[in-house]
C-alpha cells in the first residue's frame, strides 16, 4: 500500500538521538467520538463539519492518518495497550475495568511514560485514567509526575454535590473543589502544566472525557446548534464544541510560550464512536464495543512543524501500540527487545517517508470465547465467536464498510490469517475481570 501521497515529508537534518532539545509531546484523546465527526475527516457529517476547526487545524498543518487504529474497542483496554505498547490481552485486559474494582493494569507491566521520565521528561496525565483504583495503581505510581483528573471512566460534566473518590477531579491524590465545567477544567489544567514546564521537555497526555456520556453540553454551546434537529445528536455535538475549544486553548498556549515549533501534537480517539449517544462512524460498520472497523478504526491527526509537511496523508495502518515506542525514540531513547513490545516506532517512517513493513494487527474481546479480528495489508478477518458465526474476510481497499465476505473465494488467504490469529491468541491470557474471565 502506498503510504504517502506525493513527496510530502520533510527530511530531517539530524536525528533526535543527538538533538540538543528533545521535542515536547502532547497527546490529545477524545472519548467515544465518531469516525465521521471531525472536520478533517473526508467523510465528516455535514451537521458537525464546522464544529472542530482547532482539531482539524492539526491535520491541515501536519498529517491525517487514514488507517489509524486502537488496540481495543472500549475505553479501558485501549488505554492499557497504548500505555504499555503491548497488546493488553497479553495481561488479561480484554474488558473495561468495572467501577470500584480492586485491581488494574498489572503492576508487572511497565508504562512507556516511566521510560520517558528516565529520559528527562516531565510527565502529566490530565483527565481520564481508568486503569486502576487502588493506590498502587495510581497514575503518580505509574509514571506521571502530575495527575489532574478522575480515576473512573466517566462522570457528569457539571459539578456533583457529593462525588465519589473515583469520580471527583483530583490533583495528585487530593480532591479538588467541584466548580466549573469538566472539559474546561481539563483544558485549563493542561495550559497550566505547559506554562509551568515550558523549559521542557515534557510529555502531556490530555485525556478528555468528551464526548463520552452523559450528554451534558454547556447551554451556550447547545444554543449554537439549533439547526441539528435530533436532541441526542445536538447534545453530543455540543460536547464536541467544548472539546474543540479546549484543544484550541492548548494550541494557543504552546504558541504563546514559544513551544509550538518544537512540539509534536497528536489527536486521536480512544475507540469507535458510541452511536447510541449520537456519534457517527460513517462509512464504517460497527461502533464502540465492536471489532468491526467502526469499533477500532479512529480519527488520527498530528502536527510536527518542520518535520511533517502540511497536508500530508498517511495511509499505512498504524495502531496506538506504536505511540510509546515512537515517543521513546523521539526522546533519544532506544526501544529494547527485552521489553517485548508489540508496537513499533514510527519515527523513521515519519522522518524519511519510508513505508512501514506489512505486519498483522490483532484484536480480541471477552477472552477465548469472544469475538476476534485481524488486519493484514488490505485484508480484514472478523470472527464473531460470540454469535457462533464463521470467519469472514473483507478487502478493505474496496470495502471499508465490511459488506462483502470474500472468504469463499479466498480460502488460502483465510487459512493463512486464521493460523496467524490462532498463534497470536495462544500467547494471551484470559480476562482478569468481566466476560470470559479465566
Q: Where are the model-predicted features located?
A:
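Formylglycine-dependent sulfatase
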Residues: 4, 16-392, 396-438
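Bacterial N-terminal signal peptides
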Residues: 7-15
Amino acid at each position: 500500500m502506498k503510504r504517502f501521497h506525493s513527496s510530502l515529508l520533510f527530511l530531517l537534518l539530524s536525528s533526535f538521538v543527538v538533538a540538543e532539545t528533545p521535542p515536547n509531546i502532547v497527546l490529545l484523546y477524545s472519548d467515544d467520538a465518531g469516525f465521521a465527526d471531525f472536520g478533517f475527516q473526508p467523510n465528516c457529517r455535514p451537521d458537525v463539519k464546522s464544529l472542530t476547526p482547532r482539531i482539524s487545524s492539526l491535520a491541515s498543518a501536519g498529517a491525517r492518518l487514514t488507517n489509524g487504529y486502537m488496540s481495543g474497542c472500549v475505553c479501558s483496554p485501549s488505554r492499557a495497550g497504548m500505555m504499555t505498547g503491548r497488546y493488553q490481552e497479553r495481561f488479561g485486559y480484554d474488558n473495561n475495568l468495572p467501577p470500584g474494582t480492586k485491581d488494574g493494569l498489572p503492576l508487572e507491566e511497565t508504562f512507556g511514560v516511566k521510560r520517558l521520565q528516565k529520559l528527562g521528561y516531565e510527565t502529566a496525565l490530565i483527565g481520564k485514567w481508568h486503569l486502576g483504583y487502588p493506590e498502587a495503581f495510581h497514575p503518580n505510581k505509574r509514571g506521571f509526575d502530575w495527575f489532574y483528573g478522575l480515576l473512573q471512566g466517566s462522570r457528569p460534566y457539571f459539578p456533583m454535590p457529593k462525588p465519589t473518590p473515583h469520580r471527583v477531579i483530583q490533583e495528585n491524590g487530593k480532591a479538588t473543589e467541584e466548580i466549573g465545567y469538566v472539559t474546561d477544567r481539563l483544558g485549563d489544567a493542561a495550559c497550566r502544566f505547559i506554562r509551568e514546564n515550558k523549559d521542557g521537555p515534557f510529555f502531556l497526555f490530555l485525556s478528555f472525557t468528551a464526548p463520552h456520556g452523559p450528554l451534558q453540553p454547556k447551554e451556550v454551546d447547545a444554543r449554537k446548534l439549533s439547526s441539528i434537529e435530533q436532541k441526542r445528536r445536538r447534545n453530543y455535538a455540543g460536547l464536541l464544541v467544548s472539546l474543540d475549544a479546549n484543544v484550541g486553548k492548548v494550541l494557543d498556549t504552546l504558541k504563546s510560550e514559544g513551544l509550538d515549533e518544537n512540539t509534536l501534537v497528536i489527536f486521536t480517539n480512544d475507540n469507535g464512536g458510541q452511536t447510541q449517544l449520537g456519534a457517527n462512524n460513517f462509512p464504517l460498520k460497527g461502533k464502540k464495543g465492536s471489532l468491526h472497523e467502526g469499533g477500532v478504526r479512529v480519527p488520527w491527526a498530528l502536527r510536527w512543524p518542520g518535520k511533517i509537511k502540511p497536508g500530508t496523508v498517511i495511509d499505512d495502518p498504524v495502531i496506538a501500540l506504536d505511540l510509546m515506542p515512537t515517543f521513546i525514540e523521539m526522546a533519544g531513547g532506544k526501544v529494547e527487545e527485552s521489553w517485548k513490545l508489540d508496537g513499533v516506532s514510527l519515527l523513521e517512517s515519519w522522518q524519511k517517508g519510508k513505508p512501514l513493513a506489512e505486519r498483522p494487527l490483532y484484536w480480541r474481546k471477552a477472552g477465548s470465547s469472544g469475538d476476534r479480528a485481524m488486519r493484514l495489508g488490505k485484508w480484514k478477518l472478523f470472527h464473531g465467536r460470540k454469535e457462533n458465526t464463521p470467519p469472514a474476510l473483507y478487502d478493505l481497499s474496496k470495502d471499508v464498510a465490511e459488506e462483502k465476505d470474500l472468504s469463499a473465494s479466498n480460502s488460502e488467504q483465510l487459512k493463512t490469517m486464521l493460523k496467524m490469529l490462532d498463534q497470536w491468541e495462544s500467547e494471551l491470557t484470559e480476562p482478569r475481570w468481566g466476560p470470559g474471565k479465566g
